[in-house]
Amino acid sequence: MKRILMATTAAVFAAGGAQAQSEEITIGILLGFTGPAESLAPPMAGAAEAAAKEVSESGLFLDGTTVNTTRGDSTCIDAAAASAAAERLISSENVSGIIGALCSGATGAAFQNVALPNGMVMISPSATSPGLSTIEDNGLFFRTSPSDARQGEIMADILLENDVSSVAVTYTNNDYGKGLADAFEAAYTERGGEVTINIPHEDGKADYSAEVASLASAGGERLVIAGYLDQGGPGIIQAALDTGAFDLFHLPDAMIGDSIEDRFGDQLDGSLGQVPGSPNAELMVEIGEANDYDGTAPYAPEGYDAMALMLLAMQAAGSTDPQVYKDHLFDVANAPGEEILPGELAKALEILADGGEINYEGGSAVELIGPGESAGSYRQIEVVDGEITTVGYR
């Protein structure tokens, strides 16, 4: 656990952190620091902590209230561990809100088992399962990432525009993997593509030759891997390359990151993919450099935006009580109001303190829709000379 303290003044909180204007508050950052997507967590956490620091050091947040952060490990795949970590953040750390979790299953478990019963706001930067769009949340759950219902459509369009008319699909055997695989298959076949096979795989296995044999037998011009970049997914790629079953892949969001690039390099040349992102992410580079994290890493902009939106909603509400500020998330995220970009949080706080309106764009061009999730902007990638390269935005 890492804790960033930006003041030494002690504060006493009610359970759940529902103190309106205390001298300091704490926000929990609940991400999968261990598990199959662990390499994604540090830059996401760093980005969220950078936003908290920016707000706190401005001196403009709720009459000078200081913002502290504390980390919890959701492990990505262990629902019990995610719930226990969320419980600790609320009952022991007295947080006023939670940024997280990282993976969809852990997010759903932590929210439904802990956050919802305790009336706590959660904003996930990266949980994308379509199933989270319809959970009963009492207006407490939000996402700065879009649903995989949207990613499935984007993925289908990219493949067909690149004249890929048939694919095999394998997905990590959990809510995220199945939700994305099903959304993609529906969109791809509706547009005229053929899915030759759509099967799950388990993460953490030493050998994926059996799964790859089934995929190869079904055929397809490319292999779509709706898995994780630190477990499962690399094993599938390695087995496919070793056997010659596939040499071109399509990589969804949780398969894109430095660890994949470092491991396979130019063996993945010509492979395609997509991850939530917008041109605004380039504005995060300087913030990342100043705070020792990669500002353009997958889901880092969404991490910054999740923290920024939570704190700006508190400022708009004049309260750190989740039952109060939850009703202001849409107000600060969407038009009308002055557009707010990364690094402009002090400006936003001042506008809100003066009774004005803001339209927070942030690093991911976030716009909240119906169920409290981002409408969705994606960065399209291609592996060129062994490097994950941005080729456009959608």
Residue ranges of predicted features:
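Extracytosolic ligand-binding ectodomains
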Residues: 4-8, 20-394
